[in-house]
Amino acid sequence: MADGVDHIDIYADVGEEFNQEAEYGAHDQIELYEDVLSPSANNGDAPEDRDYMDNLAASVGDDVVKGSVPNIVYTYTGKRIALYIGNLTWWTTDEDLTDAVHSLGVNDILEIKFFENRANGQSKGFALICVSSESSSKKLMDLLPKREMHGQKPIVTPCNKQFLSQFEMQSRKTATQAGQMSGEGKAGPPGINARLPFPPGGRGRGRFPTSGPGGDRFPGPAGPGGPPPPFSAGMTPPRPPMCPPGPPGPPGPPPPGQPLPPPLPGPPNRGERPPPPVMFPGQPYGQPSIVTLPPGPPPPGYGPPPGPPPPQQGPPPPPGAFPPRPPGPPMALGPPPHLPGPPPGGPPPAPHVNPNFFPPPGNAGMTSSDSRGPPPSDPYGRPPPYERGDYGPPGRDMDVVRTPLSEAEFEEIMNRNRAISSSAISRAVSDASAGDYGSAIETLVTAISLIKQSKVSADDRCKVLISSLQDCLHGIESKSYGSGSRRRERSRERDHSRSREKSRRHKSRSRDRHDDYYRERSRERERHRDRERDRDRERDREREYRHR
C-alpha cells in the first residue's frame, strides 16, 4: 500500500535555491556594506537615501569597469544624479540655492536636502542636490563654484562617501574653532549668538523637503565677507591687538585651500547703519573700539547683510584730552588701564552691553573713595558692594537742605494749614456727636498727616495746630472706647448668662451620664459577685463529694 503512494521529493528544488542565492548574493553584500559604512561616514547619523546612492556608480562613472554587468536590479526608471554643494553659510536657504542653480540655466532640480544638526536644526553648511540629466550636473560642477552666495563661493563635488566625510570633518572643525573663538570673547559666527532664529523662508520651509542627517553646525564668515580662516591643530585663533588700532591696512591673501574673499562693498547707504562697536569702561569716547562685531545674517525683512563698518574717523585723541575715569571691572578683552575714560557727560554704553557690569559714564560726582574699581585680588572682577547710606530714605537732615521760603509762601501755607485744622475739628466733632466715631477719627488723622507733610511743619505755629488736632483725636478715641466698653459689658453679661445656661445643661447631662455609668458599674459588680458565689458553691460541693 505504501508503494502505490506517490512520494513528494522535498529536496527537488534545493539546487535552484542555491543558484538564486549565488545570483543575488552580491546585491545582499553590497547592501550590507552600505549599511555598515553609513554610520561611520555620517558620524552616527541616519544613512543617506539609497535611491540615488545605488545610481552613484552609474552616474559618476569613477568605479565602473567597462564590460562588467551590474548585479543591482534598478527599479527607478528615471535618471537621478546627486551632487554635494558645500562651503555654504549656515543661513543659506533652499530658495537661495534654487535661485543660484536656476541662474545657471539648470531647471531640472529633483530634490534639495540640507544637512542639519539634529540638536538645534542649524545647517552644517552643505547640501545634497539631485538633478535628472548629465548636462545639468556638468553645468553645476563647472559654473556654480564661480558664483558667490552670501560672500562665499560654493564647492560642488560628486555624491560619494569620501566627499561626505570631508564635508562632515570640515563642519566639525569649523564648529570647534567657532566654540574656541566664542569662549575667548571673539565672535566667530556672523552674530553674537549662534542660536538666532532662521530668517523667514529658510531651510525646511521652502519648496523641497529638508530632512537630512544631523551633526555640528557650519557657521558663516567671521568677518564682512569671506570664509573663516582655518587653523591647524597646534595654532590658536589670532588675538586682537591690545592697543588702539590705526587706519586699516590692505587685507592679506587668503589661506591656502580657500577661495578668494569678495571685494568689500562701499560705505552703507543712508537707510543702513553698520553695527555699533562694543564700548568698554575706561575707553575714550570717540576712540576706535578694539573689537567690532561683524555683520550677522540679515534679520527678517531687511535683505542681505550690510557692508563692513566704515573706517575710523580720524586718529584717537591724545591721552590728556579727557579727564581720567576709574577703570571698570576687568574683562578678557578690556582695554589697557592707561587709556583715559570718557567725559563726565558722555553717552551711556552701547545698548548691547549690560549696564549692570558697565556703569554709564555719568557718575563723575562720586567721591574718590567710592569711585575706585574692584580690588586687583578679585579674580572675577566683581564690583565692591554699594553703601546703602547713599540710597536710604531721606531723614530729618533733608530739612536743612530745603530752600528757604519767602514770607508770602509761608503765610499762604500757614493759612491753608489753619483752614485744614479748623474744618477737620468741626467735622470730627459733628461726626462724633452723631455716633460715627470711625469717620471722626479718620478725618483728624488725615488732617494731622497733611499738616506734617507741609513745608512749614517745623514751625512752632504748625506744631500748635498738630497738638490741638491730636488732643481732639484723643478725646474722641476715649469716647469711642467708653461706648464700646459699655457695649462690650452688655454683650459680656449676655454671654455670661448664655454660658451659665449651657453649663447647667452640660452639668445636668454629665450628671445623668455619670449616674448611668455608676449604675452600670454597680450592675456589673453584682453580676461578678453572683458568679463568684456560684463558683464557690460548686467548689464546696466538689469537696464534700470527695470527702465522702
UniProtKB/Swiss-Prot annotation:
| Residue ranges of every copy of the RRM domain listed in the record | 81-161
- What keywords are annotated for this sequence in UniProt? Cytoplasm, mRNA processing, Nucleus
Task: Kindly give the Gene3D superfamilies that the UniProt entry links to this protein.
Answer: 3.30.70.330
UniProt xrefs under SMART domains: RRM
Q: Where in the cell is it found?
A: Nucleus; Nucleus, Nucleoplasm; Nucleus speckle; Cytoplasm
Sorted alphabetically, which InterPro entries does this protein's record hold? Answer: CPSF6/7, CPSF6_RRM, Nucleotide-bd_a/b_plait_sf, RBD_domain_sf, RRM_dom
> What superkingdom heads the lineage?
Eukaryota
* Location of the region described as Disordered in the Swiss-Prot/TrEMBL record: 169-401, 473-548
Protein name as it appears in the record: Cleavage and polyadenylation specificity factor subunit 6
- Gene that codes for this? cpsf6
